[in-house]
């Protein structure tokens, strides 16, 4: 019963019935994000476990399509948080990102370093020309297969552990860079009334030489 109550009180887990599926931003609070990430990761892991446990021969439908259909909660929470963080990077959202990114990095590694899951994907990939797939399906299979290879499925255990560390560090550094870039853009807009992306137009439009010099130095 507790889990049901949690789901009903968290729009990121429960979802929303809005036109075109637009997120109900007004209902989403900072406290909802981490529990939604935890629920989303658990949901997708269970869905992947079901793909692996399927005793039928691997097919595009029961492996690739099943994987692409997984992670509905995680897709929802990532879509909301990342878009808000990139446009309205408040301290509260930044704190959420710092909690969420290591969880996401670990979850992604758990997927692409899973030998049982890769075995099913690889079986399809090795027989790709005989599966009757169209070009879009072939591309989807190749992309999924490459996600395992590029993330170290063939590495030994020690090397995979190092890969996990690198992925976590890259995720953290990318977030830090994004936060600093947004802060610089906001500071520029606060001082000059235009964003950095509007810099070129503003420089061409203003006749104030002193202002252009000031904007140039700030840019």
Predicted features and spans:
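Zn2+-dependent metallopeptidase catalytic domains
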Residues: 6-219
């Amino acid at each position: 019963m507790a889990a049901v109550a949690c789901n009903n009180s968290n729009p990121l887990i429960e979802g929303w019935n809005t036109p075109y599926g637009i997120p109900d931003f007004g209902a989403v609070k900072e406290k909802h994000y981490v529990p939604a990430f935890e629920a989303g990761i658990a949901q997708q892991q269970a869905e992947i476990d079901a793909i692996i446990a399927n005793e039928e021969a691997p097919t595009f439908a029961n492996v690739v399509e099943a994987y692409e259909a997984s992670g509905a909660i995680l897709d929802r929470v990532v879509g909301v948080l990342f878009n808000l963080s990139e446009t309205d990077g408040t301290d509260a959202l930044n704190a959420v990102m710092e909690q969420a990114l290591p969880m996401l990095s670990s979850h992604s590694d758990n997927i692409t370093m899973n030998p049982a899951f890769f075995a099913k994907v690889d079986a399809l990939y090795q027989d790709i020309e005989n599966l009757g797939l169209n070009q879009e399906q072939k591309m989807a299979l190749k992309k999924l297969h490459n996600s395992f290879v590029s993330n170290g499925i063939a590495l030994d255990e020690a090397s995979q552990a190092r890969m996990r560390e690198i992925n976590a560090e890259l995720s953290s550094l990318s977030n830090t860079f994004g936060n600093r870039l947004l802060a610089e853009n906001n500071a520029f807009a606060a001082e000059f009334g235009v964003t950095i992306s509007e810099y070129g137009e503003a420089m061409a439009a203003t006749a104030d030489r002193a202002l252009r010099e000031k904007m140039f130095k700030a840019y």
